Curated annotation (Swiss-Prot):
Belongs to the MsrA Met sulfoxide reductase family. It comes from the Bacteria. This is Peptide methionine sulfoxide reductase MsrA. The lineage of its organism: Bacteria, Bacillati, Mycoplasmatota, Mycoplasmoidales, Mycoplasmoidaceae. One of its GO terms (biological process) is protein modification process. Pfam families: PMSR. The gene is msrA.
Length: 165
């Protein structure tokens, strides 16, 4: 069955490119979530006054990739201990988060992060919330690194080759 989860971890260009290469991911789209302005522009989000985060909607076939596997992938490509910063990107729109619509997904996410937290003394700064809203970003942001192969990317894309059960 195809399911959706929304993930954030810095600039959405690299996150989208990374998840597009994961077996079982059927579709991704970048946008702005969790904010207090309807259909914000990129420029509005960059003012850090709308409370949106750059987010990637990941549609995946759970027969081929599990939610836990997707969470492992996200965890390996971001700094989970950083607040409002990933790579060179600084600001609340670059915070790390996992957003869900299904209650059973919430339990999986919370258990996953609890396990990770128990393995470290550092505080994990990934927010977990029910998806409040998701506004699709402008077309020029969609598949940005496919259109601009030399574009900025804070994500180590070669890590997508690693498999998680």
């Amino acid at each position: 069955m195809v399911k959706s989860i929304w993930v954030a971890g810095g600039c959405f260009w690299g996150i989208q490119k990374y998840f597009d290469s994961i077996k079982g991911v059927r579709h991704t789209i970048v946008g702005y979530s969790q904010g207090n302005v309807i259909n914000p522009s990129y420029e509005q989000v960059c003012t850090q006054t709308t409370n949106h985060t750059e987010t990637v909607q990941v549609d995946y076939d759970d027969r081929f990739v599990s939610l836990t596997s997707i969470l492992e992938h996200l965890y390996q490509i971001i700094d989970p201990f950083s607040l409002n910063k990933q790579g060179e990107d600084i600001g609340n729109q670059y915070r790390s988060g996992i957003y869900y619509v299904d209650h059973e997904d919430a339990l999986i996410i919370k258990n996953f992060l609890l396990q990770k937290q128990n393995q470290t003394s550092k505080k994990i700064m990934i927010e977990v919330h029910k998806l409040h809203n998701f506004n699709i970003a402008e077309e020029y942001h969609q598949k940005y690194l496919d259109k601009n192969p030399n574009g900025y990317c804070h994500v180590n894309l070669s890590l997508s080759k690693k498999r998680f059960n």
